[in-house]
């Protein structure tokens, strides 16, 4: 909802170009990551920071039965920032808001689902963690003490 409000303000003010959307819960963003995202979004129109997963991933059903083990080399964990051509993300949100949004977990999903435009991964950092649990806070403190 906060992203949509910000996008509406940009649209009302006649802004164009690109927008980066970043979680406030990811304090370890670097200039290098921002530069890579900026360069990529100008070429591809939609990109997400992320990193390859280290663990094997299992897709399960509601009964927790394993249904699939995807090829780990093709699975990345998404981070932020996520960057988009402004008109693209605004139109994607306008379309998505007419539907159920409860399953949407990041802004790239809206573009993927609504626009059919490829979204590209940009290498981030394993240090670009999202601090949401007490365990995350322990890791963040360790990063700060290094």
Report residues per predicted region.
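Short, hinge-like loop/turn segments at secondary-structure boundaries
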Residues: 38-39, 63-69, 138-139
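Short, flexible, basic/aromatic active-site loop/helix in glycosyltransferases
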Residues: 59-84
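A residue-level structural signature of the nucleotidyltransferase/glycosyltransferase Rossmann-like core
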Residues: 26, 46-48, 67, 81, ...
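Conserved alpha/beta core of the MobA/IspD/sugar-nucleotide pyrophosphorylase nucleotidyltransferase superfamily
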Residues: 76-146
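Structural motif
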Residues: 17-20, 45-48, 56, 65-67, ...
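Conserved beta-loop-beta/alpha segment of the NTase-like Rossmann-fold superfamily
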Residues: 1-62, 79
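Short, glycine- and charge-enriched coil/turn segments that flank and shape catalytic ligand pockets
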Residues: 11-17, 43, 61-67, 95-102, ...
